[in-house]
Swiss-Prot record:
Signal peptide: 1-19
PANTHER family tied to this protein: EBNA2 BINDING PROTEIN P100 (PTHR12302), SERINE_THREONINE-PROTEIN KINASE 31 (PTHR12302:SF3)
Keywords (A to Z) from UniProt: Endonuclease, Hydrolase, Nuclease, Plasmid, Signal
GO molecular function, one term: nucleic acid binding
InterPro entries reported for this sequence: SNase_OB-fold_sf, Staphylococal_nuclease_OB-fold, Thermonucl_AS
Metal-binding recorded as keyword: no
Enzyme Commission number(s) of this protein: 3.1.-.-
Protein source organism: Escherichia coli O157:H7
Family from the record: Belongs to the thermonuclease family.
Organism taxonomic ancestry: Bacteria, Pseudomonadati, Pseudomonadota, Gammaproteobacteria, Enterobacterales
EC category: hydrolase
Record-annotated active site: 46, 54, 88
Name of the protein this chain belongs to: Uncharacterized endonuclease
Length: 153
């Protein structure tokens, strides 16, 4: 019974661990990083649970363009959980119509599930669907995940 106490505390503290930002996207850096104007300053957001191709990687520019078409200049809602080691907020991004942008990027084949850190059980299902239907980066016979591509560079 005692081993479940930390889990129960975590579950009940979840609402305290996350917060929302509402703001206009002022910059799209790549397929998984945006800047949102929050009150008076731009806040860098790293989309949680996904990893998009790097700009110089195959499909990198396409992934960035996909993100731009979804959110550039639009007001989004970001549910953020924490900051990463680079100071970026890790968050779930929702388009003005409520669409989950993180999930859309994976479904479109514009990003991988960041399996090492993923907490969204829907993402692997969406990635398998994109792979089977050869969407986006999955149209490549052997796409290289960004974490492997970065390691090689």
């Amino acid at each position: 019974m005692r081993k479940y106490i930390p889990l129960v505390l975590f579950i009940f503290s979840w609402p305290v661990l996350c917060a929302d930002i509402h703001g206009r996207v002022v910059r799209v850096l790549d397929g998984d990083t945006i800047e949102v104007m929050d009150s008076r300053k731009a806040v860098r957001i790293r989309l949680v649970n996904i990893d998009a191709p790097e700009k110089k990687q195959d499909y990198g520019r396409w992934s960035t363009d996909m993100m731009k078409s979804l959110v550039a200049g639009k007001t989004v809602t970001v549910t953020y959980f924490q900051r990463d080691r680079y100071g970026r907020m890790l968050g779930q991004v929702y388009a003005p119509d409520g669409m989950n942008v993180n999930q859309f990027m994976v479904r479109a084949g514009a990003a991988w599930v960041y399996e090492q850190y993923n907490t969204d059980p829907v993402l692997p299902v969406l990635q398998n669907e994109a792979r089977q239907q050869k969407r986006g980066l999955w149209s490549d016979a052997d796409p290289v995940p960004p974490w492997i591509w970065r390691h090689r560079k």
